[in-house]
Structures are given as structure tokens and as C-alpha cells.
Amino acid sequence: MPTVLITGGSRGIGAAMVRRFYAAGWNVAFSYWQSEQAAQALATQMPGVLSVRADVADSAQVAAMFSAVYAVFPHIDMLVNNAAVVQDGLFLDLTEADWQRVFAVNFFGAVYCTGEAIRDMYPRGRGNILNISSIWGLKGASCESGYASSKAALIGLSRSLAKEWGPSGIRVNCIAPGVIDTDMNAQHSAETMQALAEEIPLGRIGRAEEVASLALYLASPEAEYITGQVFSVDGGWNIT
């Protein structure tokens, strides 16, 4: 069976991907950082799923995480860089520490994980990397300059890696979700969520399972000729 490693897999879109890949018969490993209770509950529901605590912003912890995965599964066939933090605020209010943290997790975490994964994929001549960006990485957003910039950087990374590693059989793609019904958006009021839904051509908020379904498709043989692409899962919001 193929193996997938999903970072930030204990909640939201990450947890939906853990469930979807597990249901499709994959070996599944996922990382978490603060959500230990949620991670344990998720792993308990699916025998054989491996959960590993790691801060992806720390390259040493990333290396240890990959070692823990390889101790159970011989190879990683697909890496999903999903771990992320949100950093809201006016541009002039963001501190140096704010900028460093949002890029450390959202961008450099993906860099560290991708480096570890490619070292395993390259000798085998195949592999699949999926980066989870955001609609804000495509459109930008007021009071989201830190988060949006880090997610835009993921898009540039994905396209560059697709060109660099395509000749070695490694595919790299990106998903840019819109407003999805997850804990990350639970901070918004019902009125705010309704207002957002009204801006979306399909007229509703997205579901984490819809993002997970696309991730699984991009891992499938049917998607073997797809690389370097950014897929919006946003109900058409990106075209408004």
C-alpha cells in the first residue's frame, strides 16, 4: 500500500485528508503540534494510522518526524504540507516575531518537509508532493498580509519544484482552499460567515471533505500527468 504523510493532520482539512486517504486504503501518517487530544482521538478511530508530534518550523523536529514515519512505513509516496498558523492584523501592527512565526510554519515548514521527502522519493524515481495554500495566497486580503504572503510563497515553491523535480518523476501541486468550515474559521461570527457565503458564486461555505477529495484525486494514477498546478476549491470565489 502507498503511504501518505499529512502535516497538521489532527483537525480541519488535515483531519479530513487523513480520513479520506485511510478510507482509500493508504498507509497514513500525520503530524500535529498542539492538538494532542484531537490527534489521539483521530488515530484511535483508524487502526494503523501513525500520529507524530512535531513543530514543522523546527528542521530537527521535522527530521525526527520522518525518522519516526520510516520506522513504521518503508517509504513516503505522498507528502501533504498542510500545517499552518494564522496571523491576522494590520500590516503596521505585525511584529518581527509575527512575521517570522507565520513564515516559519507555513513556508519553511513545507521547505523542511519537502527536503526530507525528496531525499526518499528521488532515488525511487517517483513521488507526489501537495502544498495547501489559500485563496488569500492568490488574491491577498486586508489584515492578512502575513498569512497571505506565506501562502503565496507556497505557490511559487510548488511551481518551481514541479519544474525542477518533474524530470525525476516527482509531481508537485498546490490546492488553494477558499472559506472552508473548519476550526480555523470558527472565530468568525455566524453573520460574518453568512456574508462570506453570499460573496461566493455557489452560495455556500466549503467543506473540508471537498478539499480532501481533490487531494486524493491528485494522488491517484488518473492524475499522473498533472504537476505544477494550483487548484482553487472555493465555490468560484476566486473569479469574482
Language model features with spans:
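Short C-terminal tail/terminal secondary-structure segment
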Residues: 139, 216, 227-240
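Alpha-helical segment proximal to the catalytic Tyr-Lys
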Residues: 119, 163-167, 224
